[in-house]
């Protein structure tokens, strides 16, 4: 046997990796020898045993340049193979790469291919896993060739036989056994791996594929087709793995004549029999080490035990075969060998896994070494430990510049030691490396000077775990400091999410020139001022700095020097330094720059003393010229640091003001000036926080006096409610809700009172109020608990449905200043603990969400400038009303490219032509301009780039406000931008200590602009009612669903805005009215849905029976008796059914209209009463979420949307436009029919008790919900198509983040992820392509497959075509035209063809987990989840990984194809290197030539 001499398969550059099943030949080609003995090392000499699992002869020496027996030592014998012990003299590192093998006595089935779902071997042989198992584990025989005996006995190929049946046939037909094995008449049956090997070897895959496709086309049985499809997938995978490989032609050596030369191609691929192994590879010994411990014991890798079991059993079996042992014993030994090999490859799949002796845990097999967080992929390939790094505790460094960090000397000397040593040797301070090291150890003073020089201009990277987004690693210029803690700048804490309570950070040194350059240019902290997730600044002052700036810029009447007039800002500073004027004094300053007035100067003239009339007159004239500034001394001081271009900032600076100012600075004056400004205001902020001496004393928390009265009143009210409940006039639910409402109102009242009290205290200079108002620390919520009352406490519960018991109804009346009673304290501990436990549990969930997002989007990279699409998405101004002003129209379009002209409808002006970028200025202008009501913008969702996305569809890079560059890894940025706030989402209840905040729902809808009202499909009726004051009034009631109010421009009649009007709303405006901004259009009741009579007639109740379907309850306020529908199913026998409904009948008793009444409805009408149009028949209450801000609903909701899960109680959605009708009622469901004018009808069955939104005869549109409940994204995709579902997902996720958590994430990040969820299509009809029905493939691959077929035709009749043309086959159109020309010329019959059929498909919405597993890259999918399954499928299909994404390249150790790792940049640097080398060579040649000529002259 010849072994390849250790040729590494990865020598040189490679661009793709192919996966396939290893053939016995390839295993032997990689092996250096056979392992024959189970021994590892000799326990006396501690040397490896020869031919054992650690053998030096096979795997290489254990000591560098030394053979086993010691005959050859030293490097000079390199490459010699010792004649005594057979060991090659080489480095010991080869023990990490050299492999061995074990030759098995009988073939063994590879467990991956037989236990995978579906079983690969089972699919090929058409056997179930159970039957396969019985054959493999030597329980039954399988017939390989029935021969004559089989025919006579009616036995077919692949039949299973028991031992008795087998021996019966063998004895009955003894002569038959003498025939040759290849004789078709001979009866052959075998068991175990051998049988499977023989069967797989005899398979004809091409024939099998044709037969299976025939079944798919022609079979009527659904089950048969499903089975055929499952098998065809495996067969096709094997067939696809065969691909032509160029054969290297040997130069003619006379071995065979030229005409006998072989074909230039051979077909290489997976043969099915490779799934049964005859040879097992043994991995290198250093990858399964054996380490000696103290006390003469050894720690060993589990793999050694598993290999040992295989070798022992294999050797025993060989012996037994040699001595001709009985069949029973052999069979048992063979079965044990099969089990040993199974355990070696995958020990976790088996029920009876092999366990260790002592701790009884399953041994870690080869599969386990790849799987999971501790597996090879995630532990060693995706994350590695790095040298040149250190970590330490962090402390604040307030005197540092923004781009600096303080590095302890002791750390710096360790990190930069090699560079220091080199300097010391170069400068001759030390003679050798050794002496330089000694100098360093002695801490010689000269070393620090050298270190200073070494680190100058060399950035270091700081990282704080967990690194949730890219700002978790930033570069800084190190400054050497004494001490042992790293100092960091206070402004970068936000980005790192760091504080100084013991956090640690890691330091890394970029070594290469390129790495240093990238760190300085791209990663320096002063270049990362903007958050990539929202485009908002991240280096925002906080806490002390904010408080200092707020204190500095606040004004106070009556300060020293108030009302003085100064000629310029310098004069003000002189006066202040001379202490002639107070910091908060209002003064008049002559100023020539840009003025943004905050005070009305003429009104402020009163603060000038009356004895200076001429000053007042002079001021009046100057104010007219807008040259006089009314400001405070502090603001003048603050504005010294604001760049001139920005103008004078004349307002109190709080946290939000600071944030907006920094945002403005970064876009207008650039990073350098902004960084300088930040450093200045840091100094100013800290200085004035100190000067102001702002700290909280107990006296600063002021409790309002009115609190006592409010509480007395509330206690009275709640006692009254309880009394009514005891009388039986209130239900439990109503009592609870009313008490909660009473206390909620009181808590809010007291909170507002205490806030106002603080605001007025010391004319706004109460330290507690200043901290709150400036945004430095604390929230209104906390102040309420300190000085108002703690109020109601939420009871921790998972559900968010608003059921009773979510809020503990006894409030905490005390506040934290007064102190809590024992009971109150006990009640509040509950919520506080929940906050902490939630935090720790949810952080893991958020981390897992981030990981899945990363995996699904890691290969989305900007690959081209413009994909050329004309499509885009449509954005309307209505988004603001829907989200309560949280999401602005301008935010939706900012930084995008317009796909159509953006037009001002009022003035007919094009504000921005198609293809233009919507910059910040344009976006703000559009926001203010009411004429722009809609915009079409380019989006990632509609990008048509072949791979990755294009920069026009993505828009601007948020962190630099420029169009995104090619090579930007936008997928990873998107994943980080969504995942990082995900961990904040979780910490939401944390600070409020679990107190409940209930919202009082908004009932009025106001116009957001001036305009004229136009009604669209609104049917209304006027109704007499009694208002709150007891006076009669007429209201206009909307009695039609889907009504709309449009706002038009009064002059041109152009459409500006649309509002949806709910059923039962009260109209405040009339059609054609002119309305102003903030005028009320209509009001609606948010807590309930009303059922309103739409026709006149008499009421008739059906199935509304007292005690069965309704009960009587008394309304506490009015004393009216209410009839409430109850769940009747609990009251009746199983066979009985009821459907409570209200009919309206005419005089003849004919039914005019039917209204089903859902459970919990209140009836507002009596049986037999006459009703007019617009009368209320019943009210259906809605559940309101009472508990505010607990994000437990937030994260699971986001996960549900990203995973595209079907909601637990989904709404039933109409699939067509049409009119609603009802079918007969069943026991547990009722039928809704939707019929359109073309006679198409769809039927839906609804569970009884579910509220049906549609009434008989209502018109509905496709996609409209017919019942209540959440709409399933899968339904939206099916009915309204991919665009609708993409928009739905983006908007819904955005709502959770913005409204529940107040976190801003730009839409484009969500779009990148949602695009990935819709990348796949499912093939419906494959046509003439090679696809299979039901295949899930990438959209681009589907388009490619169809375009391939579009150039081909199918031959229907071959005429006189040459023999190579077959009927029914596909050929290129050009080829057939050419052949037909030839045939026509020779007057022969032409070839008849028809166009090839294209495949059809429908888009599929995948959750992010499925999408990540379905990625084109094998390596990426394998490192994500289900490693063994992914690798098995890839090996069978011979898949090729093109290394297109980031993850694959990290794993194989290449530069990532993004940023500076893009191919075009790499090529650039290689070209430059080549040029540099050429010019250096030329120079050297010149010099050599010159030297030679010099010698000649001499």
UniProtKB/Swiss-Prot annotation:
Residue sites binding Zn(2+) 2 per the record: 867, 943, 950, 953
List of residues binding Zn(2+) 1: 67, 69, 82, 85
Entry-linked Pfam families: RNA_pol_Rpb1_1 (PF04997), RNA_pol_Rpb1_2 (PF00623), RNA_pol_Rpb1_3 (PF04983), RNA_pol_Rpb1_4 (PF05000), RNA_pol_Rpb1_5 (PF04998)
Protein EC: 2.7.7.6
Binding positions for Mg(2+) per the UniProt entry: 499, 501, 503
Gene Ontology cellular-component terms listed: DNA-directed RNA polymerase complex
Catalytic activity field: RNA(n) + a ribonucleoside 5'-triphosphate = RNA(n+1) + diphosphate
Keyword annotations from UniProtKB, A to Z: DNA-directed RNA polymerase, Magnesium, Metal-binding, Nucleotidyltransferase, Transcription, Transferase, Zinc
Molecular function per GO: DNA binding; DNA-directed RNA polymerase activity; magnesium ion binding; zinc ion binding
Gene Ontology biological process terms in this record: DNA-templated transcription
Keyword presence, Transmembrane: no
Cofactors, names only: Mg(2+); Zn(2+)
Cofactor remark from the record: Binds 1 Mg(2+) ion per subunit. Binds 2 Zn(2+) ions per subunit.
SUPFAM superfamilies per record: beta and beta-prime subunits of DNA dependent RNA-polymerase
Similarity comment: Belongs to the RNA polymerase beta' chain family.
Summary of subunit composition and partner proteins: The RNAP catalytic core consists of 2 alpha, 1 beta, 1 beta' and 1 omega subunit. When a sigma factor is associated with the core the holoenzyme is formed, which can initiate transcription.
Function: DNA-dependent RNA polymerase catalyzes the transcription of DNA into RNA using the four ribonucleoside triphosphates as substrates.
This protein's name: DNA-directed RNA polymerase subunit beta'
Lineage start: Bacteria, Pseudomonadati, Chlorobiota, Chlorobiia, Chlorobiales
